[in-house]
Curated annotation (Swiss-Prot):
GO terms for cellular component: cytoplasm; cytosol. It comes from Xenopus laevis. It holds the Pfam family Ndr. The lineage of its organism: Eukaryota, Metazoa, Chordata, Craniata, Vertebrata. Residues 347-367 have a biased composition (Polar residues). Contributes to the maintenance of intracerebral BDNF levels within the normal range. May enhance growth factor-induced ERK1 and ERK2 phosphorylation. May attenuate growth factor-promoted ELK1 phosphorylation in a microtubule-dependent manner. Residues 1-21, 333-367 are annotated as: Disordered. Keywords: Cytoplasm. This is Protein NDRG4-B. Residues 1-12 have a biased composition (Basic and acidic residues). InterPro entries: AB_hydrolase_fold, NDRG. Signal peptide: none annotated. Belongs to the NDRG family. It is found in: Cytoplasm, Cytosol. One of its GO terms (biological process) is signal transduction.
Length: 367
């Protein structure tokens, strides 16, 4: 098991005395370079925002948010983080909003059938075709991570890599369904969604972060549309994946994957289980210390460093600075696979960078 440690040399968030930027700030962060599009797909319209233009054969970075959020609530803090600009200048970035979840979305008419999770995944090729993307690197959180995993299983040739945060590969059984229904009867929809996004400790402490998201989920996401998305996510099926060699004709994600979860996140056990279903030769497991349910919001600096390292492992950005990444050589390798295992792209990180070369084995990362 390889371990990476990330010492902080500057605050993760601009306001050192707050857990997150004010609600007004993170909802109205500079969006002048972003262009909005409504794209027709086989299962309805998708609202997306895009910055940059496709750069040759380089993949686009495509994001998909969690249930209860939209691209702004989920990703603004991460993509506005200072060090993230070094990455985004090399890629076109496209944020996808699940149907009806964007700010100002019209309410769906009564009787509207919300797309299934499989159909949400099947809408993404229309986005790629619209912009001329040849391939993508996906960043998904929660429900968005599930959508990207399903997309990669259906269209593996379109995916070069994925960062899956808080993914739950399991469907909901009837007991889970009943518990969800009971929760809906005793709690408001925003409170039910908050229990999905945050740990019980975070909710009990009623942190400023939780308070901000409670307000934004209630005011910035159409509640009727959110209920439809929430119901569909809780009707999802198992992602039919198995680690190669464990069952005959095992099917799993072929592209490099970085799994991310906070060590105090409600999705921790689910992400650990997902890791057991993936190919150890191209999977990195990042468990973020002192982080709850939204590591991309509370720990954007650490996640940016890990993402930069992940991209370098795919052969991109070989000269990108890694000034805040300290690598520990004291941890042991746990994967049975050789470090000479193949990746779709050669890793360009050299031994001179503190001695870590190719990352061709499963790593568990603590930071």
């Amino acid at each position: 098991m390889s371990e990476l440690r990330f010492p902080e040399e500057k605050p993760l968030l601009r306001g050192q005395d707050t857990e997150m930027e004010s609600a007004d700030t993170f909802m109205s962060a500079a969006d002048t370079d972003w262009k909005e599009h409504d794209i027709e797909t086989p299962y309805g319209m998708l609202h997306v925002v895009i910055r940059g233009t496709p750069k040759g054969n380089r993949p686009a970075i495509l994001t998909y948010h969690d249930v209860g959020l939209n691209h702004k609530l989920c990703f603004n803090t991460f993509f506005n983080y200072e060090d993230m600009q070094e990455i985004t200048k090399h890629f076109v970035v496209c944020h996808v909003d699940a149907p009806g979840q964007q700010v100002g979305a019209s309410q769906f008419p009564q009787g509207y059938q919300y797309p299934t999770m499989e159909q949400l995944a099947a809408m993404l090729p229309s986005v790629m075709q619209h912009f001329g993307f040849q391939s993508i690197i996906g960043i998904g959180v929660g429900a968005g991570a599930y959508v990207f995993a399903k997309f990669a299983l259906i269209f593996p040739e379109l995916v070069e890599g994925m960062v899956l945060i808080n993914i739950d590969p399991n469907g909901k059984g009837w007991i889970d369904w009943a518990a969800s229904k009971l929760s809906g009867l005793t709690s408001s929809l925003p409170e039910t969604v908050l229990s999905h996004l945050f740990s019980q400790e975070e909710l009990m402490n009623n942190t400023e972060l939780v308070q901000n998201y409670r307000q934004q989920i209630s005011s910035c996401v159409n509640q009727s549309n959110l209920q439809l998305f929430w119901n569909m996510y809780n009707s999802r099926r198992d992602l039919e994946m198995s680690r190669p060699g464990t069952v005959p004709n095992a099917k799993t994600l072929r592209a490099p994957v970085m799994l991310v979860v906070g060590d105090n996140a409600p999705a921790e056990d689910s992400v650990v289980e997902c890791n057991s279903k993936l190919d150890p030769t191209n999977t990195t497991f990042l468990k973020m210390a002192d982080s709850g349910g939204l590591p991309q919001v509370t720990q954007p600096g650490k996640l940016t460093e890990a993402f930069k390292y992940f991209l370098q492992g795919m052969g991109y950005m070989p000269s990108a600075s890694m000034t805040r990444l300290a690598r520990s050589r004291t941890a042991s390798l746990t994967s049975a696979s050789s470090v000479d295992g193949a990746r779709p792209r050669p890793c360009t990180q050299s031994e001179s960078s503190d001695g870590i070369g190719q990352i061709n084995h499963t790593m568990e990362v603590s930071c």
